[in-house]
Amino acid sequence: MKKILFPFLLLTLSFCKEKVAPPEPILPVPSERQIAWQELQYYGFVHFNMNTFSDREWGFGDEKPEQFNPTELDARQWARIAKEAGMKGLIITAKHHDGFVLWPSKYTEHSVKNSPWRDGKGDLIREFVDACREYGLKVGIYYSPWDRNHPDYGKPEYITYMRNQLTELLTNYGEIYEVWFDGANGGTGWYGGANEERKVDKFSYYGWPTTHELVRTLQPGAMMFSDAGPDVRWVGNEDGFAYETTWSNLMGDSVYAGMPDFDKWATGQENGTHWIPAESDVSIRPGWYYHAYEDHKVKTLPELMEIYYKSIGQNSSLLINFPVDTRGLIHEKDEEAILKMAAKVKEDFAVNLAKEASFEASTDRGKGYTAELLNDADFNTYWTTPDGQMQASVEVDFGKSVSFNRLLIQEFVNLGQRVKAFSLEKEVNGTWEKIAEGTTIGYKRILVVPDTEAQKIRINFLDGKGIPVISEIGVFSAPALLYPPKITRTPAGKVSIEAAESDLEVYYSIDGNAPKAGQNAYSGEFEVLQPATIQAIAVDSKTGKTSDPARVDFDLAKGTWKVISSDTLAIRAIDERATSYWTSKTNDLTIDLGQEVDLKGFTYLPMQARYPSGYIAEYGLEVSNDGKSWKRVTQGEFSNIQNSPIEQWIKIDAAKARFVRLKSLRTTDGNAATFGEFGVITR
């Protein structure tokens, strides 16, 4: 009898050991639709509507359907680019604040059915949906609750109109993965000819609970976005950045779309009652809609990569906008930029050094929750600790010394977001040295660290709302971002050269010859007061690869110049900062150069702010030796400056001058002349 009972007892104990209970969830937790959405991480926005043709960001509502007339519209081009960029879906502006709609809605005449496009028979939402389906992309719909065209906006009747249109969008086009409600609402507008200001109670007017219920009924799997959710929230800025500390938890009952002090809620709250994760939205240009004058302002690769790491790498999804142009195409420069970003992301995460490494935890919960699950590429398996064991660590042994600069960690957020503090260390001669530390992790956290050599690293989980529940740990060595260095000079003549990454070496030249690796290394700012051409390259010492060269042609430094004006802000016209500008009430700029120069021309940079004003269209340049007697030495126009507001270089016959005055004879919009930056040409 004993011989029978003993094996049975062992079998029972073994069975019990395998049945380790999972940890209790830490509320709130995501819904199934939120989990599916979180896995997308990266998708695109398409801003294309009446604003594209009125050249506005926010239309007033008085536009005419006849204005909407793209000449080469190709939604398949949009979908192809998004797919090649690695995006998982696209969201389109079905209706923006101006009220014009991109489908033949039976509830309004302010739509594509009364435009010349496709002879009034087109349905842009249908073309968009078909293109997305062809390329395997999920479909999202942006719908602005505010309508500056509709005569009933601000009245109960408008809410019926809004819900009728949502019903059209959510029943006629198949599965929708995200419905995007803008937080801007209420203000001046055309409103069917009333041409007035209408204010609404942003909390109660739209009857959001009923509207949300409608969306749930028609599209059960769709995420709803607004400032406050209910499924996904605005990150609180339009820069594409989440935060060092970003919680997916939100005090959902205290937040509503359009609330005035939303910024204090943007990072989420540790004690939030609802699971409403962040979505980081940003345009690939300054504006959301296409403007030809922004063709030179497409975000650079370093800017886009910073956005990637500060959004997806900080517990947020990333929504990048394409301002489709008047042809109906994503502009070539936008396509080039987004595909370069896609290639760089792929390069950065090409090899997971942790895949072949061994993992050992200071403790674990038992079978099914051990450290070897941390590199199995399966989000649904995870390592965790016994109940009450808040602090723990995981060692990663690569088996040999490796170089890395990225640490990726994912929490199994299906059981709630937990980690409040963690650190990364490397082993050096038997002791541990801290490399970096962080706060929240969430669905994904990516630490960007300096190039580090180590055979063993340790991740310490220091504090949390509950025991750590970690799904994946990845370690990567991202190649250096080899981009032309940024060369700048202060008015005092101090030149600085900055590479895209701090680990890169920089070499430069000022003699007109091309810079060469190993020759004339940049070690700090240096002085250049006279005209000079400075060129620079960035070099990755590990690979020997170099960036394309950067080049800047400087003329006289401006440290001794004086702007003759009673307006103290006039100095902004010569402060060597492209982001600043000065508005001249007298439509001119007068400068004392501090010495007589042999003037051979001048440069004028229009203001580079997002909303331009006062670009000089026609100019006159005058010179003087005493500041009293003036002579006009040239007069002309800055051709196409409205659409291409880049620095203008104007050469003149040589003239002696100590004082110069640039006069605006006409601006592009009739407003007072603005000066982004003024310079002289003396060589």
Give the positions of each predicted feature.
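C-terminal motif of bacterial Sec signal peptides marking the signal peptidase cleavage site
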Residues: 14-15
